[in-house]
Amino acid sequence: MDALYTQKILALVAKIDRIGQLDAPDARASGVSKLCGSKVCVDMNMRDGIVTDFAHEIEACALGQASSAIMAREIIGATSDELRIVARDMRRMLKENGYPPQNSDRGGNWSELSLLESVRDYKNRHASTLLTFDAVEDCLVQLGV
């Protein structure tokens, strides 16, 4: 279990940006892990298929907070396709022994999600780690992009 809570993961938890809610989000979605009760709620604005603003409220374990911290740092400027690819790669990394997400062509530093690769061996932690991705994808569906 100590392998999960590395200093790098704890450093992410200590600096989570974009906490709160947007005044007038284009989409809002939340997710709850049935296993541990972790909860994430995200607000998102998009213009011309690109994320222009984002905020989130997080009541989650360190792993859910760490993935949310990376999401908040990298999401502005991302396209719906980029976000779907990152979410797909995260699921593959955790559930199918896949490779971690890679940096995007526009410069999104998604490769830092590799810090969560050790979660793969703890299936009971997958849901909380993926909450932010699930909520963002729900927002994309709401926006029809």
Predicted regions and their residues:
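Secondary-structure capping and boundary motifs in well-ordered enzyme cores
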Residues: 36, 63, 124-125
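Proteins with a high burden of low-complexity, intrinsically disordered sequence enriched in S/T/G/P/A and R
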Residues: 35, 69, 103-104
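Structured beta-strand/loop patches that form or line metal/cofactor-binding pockets in enzymes
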Residues: 15, 19-58
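C-terminal binding/interaction regions
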Residues: 1-19, 78-145
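Short, surface-exposed, polar/charged, turn-prone segments marking secondary-structure boundaries
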Residues: 40-41, 49, 72-73, 82-85, ...
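Short, thiol/selenol-centered motifs that function as redox-active sites or metal-ligating centers
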Residues: 59-65
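Alpha-helical support elements that line or immediately flank enzyme active sites
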Residues: 67-79
